């Protein structure tokens, strides 16, 4: 047994912050920008309830404060945009005929508008829709000229502002998944050893395979998140989920590329597939957008966050609300309260009946142990469910069952501790001893007792693997009443 238990502790943020009894199992991801780019402002967000971030300062917070927060890097992907506009904006009306060009960066007028897509004239066809500024403006292709310009007729007009995004919902674009900028950014992500990297505009599973190959070539432990925001990704969703380490429902562009009425069902299907494959899933975009400049969310936003929790998302994400909003910490705190209330009153815990292990699966035996650990924890009304993992697989599987009992994961892999911050219900601890299984379980119970998570008389379900030194898949299950 360890002589000094404290050196193995992951200092759980909820315990140290005095809110261990209000731990929210659905995690919060916050985007960092000018509104929260200082150490003190970031610390406010962390104390409010954030579990994963896109930021540099987090490492300092993880070192100096009692938190383990994930760092998530975002690759922009092939985002198409219009160029500059004369007078800062170009009024367009239904029926206007415009010319799009990718050959020269002209200042936009009704005669010619630059679009940052060299293959535009090759990929679009007459009749294809082109959406601009998140779908606020819509045009349709009426002609493709011999010299490579694209003539369009305005369907829905307004003011065409500079640098606004362009979506091609009817077109299969031929750009690579990663741009030159993405490749440079990936080098930085690898160098900085970020926990997660999100790939934008994933279209097919090969996009994820390529990114994972690049990470593997550099011996990087960074895990990959596939952002689902293209109809083609939905067509290949099963394979993308299987190949990715996690998935993000990126509803901004998805809601432009798809008819808006199809987005709710798409979100639910993505979440369902991720839970069935034990892959963390994040619901993102415009969740609390009114709080960019207000102190209270719209009622529809409250329901949106609640529905994401009820559908089983591992995490919900804030974007402009924390990056550029006026009240970043208040937004996080408000979201945390919504999550806690839903989990307290309405959440459908224990999904193991939906996820019975399949005998043909290569991981059937370890899956069966995890499945029955969650079932046993439920039947015994256990006060804690404890898992051990080296790769993270056991943690992801146990989390996917959404167990009623508090879930604690121990790992000797320090890189995993932060990565697991994204998973539903997981509180992770670093523990590197490899003695007898009885000693390891004794240590785990002592650590959890020391932190105030369990006490004498509590029932605890443990999983592990034997023999310890062989690091096999989970193959052991034990239930204990603490003395």
Model-derived features: where do they sit?
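Non-catalytic helical/linker scaffolds that mediate oligomerization, partner binding
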Residues: 1-483
